[in-house]
């Protein structure tokens, strides 16, 4: 597509990695090896204003845009690598060092699989799309095609294990922030109603406080959620919605 330069407000970049509070650099980017990557690496080469954003926070921006009724929410970004974000007070919670919502590094089992962060048993090693791919021994799309169209006990058990670990994390985090949960990212389109009901049952199974079905939502934009969410930075500027 050819767009007139005056029609382009800027370029917003959603990247894996924790962004500095001033938005000028990546302070931790072990997955992509982009630690210390600078916003100026892009802005110096592109003829438009540039904005850098953590992909999980960008995803949360989009989910908040799509769910304006939510004052607070927990976002699980089920991409190739797991991501998380928190919405509080109708905005994405950043934290003092931009590290709020890193659900992927909650320890599920201290003796579990090695995580890229150097620890073991992080939620990343159980609930990322990559972890599901490794457990299934096949691409994610193929896994769900077989799972949804055939009776394959082995694959059903793999998916059940995945949902069990996700439910464990949701149940514990929901005690910290009493709010709705949004399943977002690459794996979200594969979730069926039966999966959500199973997940809800596992969340409530050992919980004193019960979550209801209306508190569990699925995002609509799949793997493109962070990219669309990042673009909202300039959309909000155009609409004069930035604080």
Q: What residue spans do the PLM features occupy?
A:
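Glycine-rich phosphate-binding loop and adjoining helix at the ATP-binding site
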Residues: 1, 5-72, 194-205
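ATP-binding/phosphotransfer module of carbohydrate and carboxylate kinases, centering on a glycine-rich
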Residues: 1-7, 46-48, 66-67, 114, ...
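Small-residue faces within membrane-embedded alpha-helices
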Residues: 14, 79-81, 229
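Short beta-strand/turn micro-motifs composed of small residues
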Residues: 15, 77, 185
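Short, active-site-adjacent cap segments at secondary-structure transitions
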Residues: 17-21, 57-60, 83-84, 93, ...
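Generic structural "secondary-structure junction" signal
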Residues: 20-21, 28, 33, 105-108, ...
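Glycine/GP-enriched mid-protein hinge/lid loop-to-helix segment characteristic of carbohydrate kinases
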Residues: 40, 44-153
